[in-house]
A protein has these predicted regions:
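Auxiliary Fe-S-binding modules of radical SAM enzymes
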Residues: 1-102, 253-261, 267-361
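Short secondary-structure boundary/capping segments
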Residues: 56, 102-104, 157, 190
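Short linear Ser/Thr-Pro motifs
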Residues: 59, 115-116, 201, 224
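Exposed loop/turn and edge beta-strand positions of beta-sandwich/beta-sheet ligand-binding modules
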Residues: 62, 110, 161-164
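Short beta-strand motif preference
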Residues: 66, 78, 112-114, 223
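Canonical Radical SAM [4Fe-4S] cluster-binding loop centered on the CxxxCxxC motif
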Residues: 84-98, 104-151
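Conserved AdoMet/S-adenosylmethionine-binding subsite of the radical SAM
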Residues: 150-330
Length: 361
């Protein structure tokens, strides 16, 4: 854009600085640009600034689900979780037993869950986002824009405020890899969120796991496991037919970890489907030889999903079996389940069902 206008390359840096650091909302507000260039940008309809918050829903636990709209009318969801979703890492590890609502500023850290695509093509059978199908990839600017819009609405500013990011919203980040990595670099350089405070979750795009391990600047890696054998995983996650557990776990074993770093494996527990003691034992064998930790997620319910949430005692037994084998295992507490903001519930739901009613702004 800058080159096409015949402007020097450093103008691009001025625009990025104005958008992400000065938080301008139009080209006319970028005082470092020549007036003529600003007018040209305005005349061409160039969108400068952040996406628009179209709607937001507030949970009883303080979680906020944002419906964020882009210039072409498409929208995604972004989730704000005061106190994160458990643990300093912001990835659900070391989750506590309960979380109080955080309407006031009484939190030490927060986590933002970011979307990478409009919809999702991976088609996990227990995820509401899969029901949307896939519309398009998000640009790097749209991913960063989600974060900036939420930070502005919450009146926080990293690095002064401790903000974690998880790329675990709508979409598969590794199917939009180049834009995702560009967004990471922009977030580090201009927004002030260091990559160790970011985690990306993949359903198992094996070639991109290899690529990701070679990145000089990268977030932490989480892998969505969800089954203890290929037959079950192929039924729950059709992607497994292309990259099965053998290929996926080989990529995990080869992944270059930093000191004290572990790969997080996420496991959504479905009642009497993958939540038995035999499944826990199989998971232990799968993770043998990998510096890993396991996040257990009891299914978050939603219409159109043909699975049920497991009983609490089955979750506890599963966790005990894995921990006894020496694998750190944590139960991620649900955040925003009442407003369809929890893991697997993002489907741009506007009308909240009576059983899941909460405050709407």
């Amino acid at each position: 854009m800058v080159e096409q206008a015949g402007e020097p390359a450093y103008r691009a840096q001025q625009i990025l600085d104005a958008v992400y650091r000065q938080k301008v909302e139009s080209a006319e507000q970028i005082s470092t640009l020549p007036q003529q260039f600003r007018q040209e940008l305005e005349g061409q309809g160039v969108s400068v600034g952040w996406p628009r918050i179209e709607n937001k829903f507030v949970s009883e636990d303080g979680t906020v689900r944002y419906l964020i709209a882009f210039a072409d009318g498409q929208s995604v969801e972004t989730v704000w979780m005061p106190e994160g979703d458990g643990g300093e890492a912001g990835d659900g590890s070391e989750a506590g037993d309960s979380a109080e609502g955080n309407r006031a500023r009484n939190w030490d850290r927060a986590t933002i869950c970011v979307s990478s695509q409009v919809g999702c093509a991976v088609d996990c059978q227990f995820c509401l986002t899969a029901l949307l199908g896939i519309e398009r990839n998000l640009t790097a600017g749209e991913m960063v824009g989600q974060v900036c819009a939420v930070l502005k609405d919450q009146k926080v500013s990293p690095p002064e405020d401790r903000i974690n990011l998880v790329f675990m919203g709508m979409g598969e980040p590794f199917l939009n890899y180049d834009n995702f990595m560009k967004a990471v670099r922009l977030l580090v350089k201009y927004v002030g969120i260091a990559e160790p405070r970011m985690t990306v979750s993949t359903a198992g795009i094996v070639p991109r796991i290899h690529d990701f391990g070679l990145e000089p600047t990268r977030p932490k890696l989480a892998i969505s496991l969800n089954a203890s054998n290929d037959e079950l995983r192929s039924r729950l996650m059709p992607l497994n037919r292309k990259w099965n557990l053998e290929k996926l776990l080989a990529a995990a074993r080869d992944f270059p970890l930093r000191p004290r770093e572990r790969i997080t494996f996420e496991y959504v527990l479905l009642r009497e489907v993958n939540d038995g003691a035999e499944h826990a034992t199989e998971v232990v064998e799968l993770l043998r030889g990998i510096r890993a930790k396991l996040n257990l997620i009891a299914l978050n319910p939603g219409p159109g999903i043909g699975f049920a949430t497991p009983a609490d005692e089955r979750v506890v037994i599963f966790q005990k079996i894995v921990r006894k084998a020496g694998v750190p295992a944590f139960v991620r507490r649900p955040r925003g389940r009442d407003i369809y903001a929890a893991c697997g519930q993002l489907k741009r739901t506007v009308e909240i069902l009576p059983a899941m009613e909460s405050q709407r702004l």
